Amino acid sequence: MLIIENDQDIRHVIEFILQEHGLDTLSTPEPENLSEIIPFAPDVILLDEFINSRPGHRLCKQIKHVAGLKHVPVIILSTANDIELIAAECEANDHISKPFDINDIVDKVVRMINHTSIAY
């Protein structure tokens, strides 16, 4: 489970809660490049739409076109009103609106992990 969130407080809360639910997590405000993500082989990527150097939807689109990552489910987090459209355009598997209910994040992440493990 990889969390890409530029807000340190939000990132730490999400990471703590997911770890409390038994999930292995790695978090970063933003990866320098996609090759950093591949060795970690995350089950799911939770991606903030508004990271520092580029929009999250661009990073999502890049992830979905990298051989070692394209099968990894991506969940976009955003305050944008058009989050459903953004998620669809960048090929994200799901989306969560901010402010969010932490239980919604846990439920969606666990569902994605279970779905992915069944598919592979």
Segments predicted by a language model, with ranges:
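Acidic di-acidic motifs
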Residues: 5-6, 79, 98
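The C-terminal output helix
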Residues: 110-120
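Active-site beta3 strand of CheY-like receiver
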Residues: 41-47, 51
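Alpha4 helix (beta4-alpha4-beta5 surface) of REC/receiver domains from two-component response regulators
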Residues: 58, 80-96, 107
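Two-component/phosphorelay signaling modules centered on CheY-like receiver
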Residues: 7-26, 32
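Hydrophobic/aromatic residues positioned on beta-strands within the core alpha/beta folds
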Residues: 75-77
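C-terminal output helix
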Residues: 100-110
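Short amphipathic alpha-helix used as the core "switch/output" element in two-component signaling
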Residues: 57-70
